[in-house]
A protein has these predicted regions:
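Bilobed periplasmic-binding protein-like "clamshell/Venus-flytrap" ligand-binding domains
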Residues: 42-45, 87-122
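Bilobed "Venus flytrap"/periplasmic-binding protein-like clamshell domains
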Residues: 1-9
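Short, solvent-exposed loop/beta-turn-alpha elements that line the ligand-binding surface or hinge
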Residues: 32-37, 58-85, 114-145
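Extracytoplasmic/periplasmic, Sec-exported soluble proteins
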Residues: 2-3, 22, 26, 45, ...
């Protein structure tokens, strides 16, 4: 895996740090290693389930089943309760920003890359709907002119 090799090479430049890579299939990584905490560092991914930052921020809640690193911070838990109750969008955004900053300051996660995608569409294709979350494209309304 190119990313794993790159990270191993980068980490090996840090004095005193030795990295032993373990390649595994997705099923083992998720259901054995991540679920049971059988790792020191793991490269994993998360994609949004819905169009709101909490799809990522909920991962930092104490006890969240997808919080594989068992990160726990009472401030984050408290802020997330406020996020869930806040109806003012600006205040909610400020609270979520505090959650993200706290988790980053704690090194709860280290973002390495962001998945992207590109697509080409002919000028005569109309009605193609792109979504940033869930199924990337909806073809229901496509017409060819």
């Amino acid at each position: 895996d190119t990313m794993a090799e790159y990270l191993q090479g980068s980490f090996s430049k840090l004095k005193g740090l030795k990295v032993n890579m373990v390649a595994t299939v997705k099923k083992d990584r998720i259901y054995n290693r991540e679920a049971n905490g059988n790792f020191q560092v793991v490269c994993t991914r998360w994609g949004p389930d819905y169009a709101d930052p909490t799809t990522y921020l909920n991962l930092f809640l104490t006890g969240n089943q997808n919080n594989y690193g068992k990160y726990s911070n009472a401030k984050v838990d408290s802020l997330m309760k406020q996020v869930q109750a806040e109806s003012d969008l600006n205040k909610r955004w400020d609270l979520m920003t505090q959650v993200e900053k706290t988790a980053l300051d704690d090194l709860a996660y280290i973002p390495v890359f962001e998945k992207g995608a590109a697509a080409l569409k002919a000028k005569n294709v109309k009605g193609l709907v792109h979504s940033a979350v869930g199924v990337p494209y909806t073809f229901k309304y496509v017409t060819i002119k």
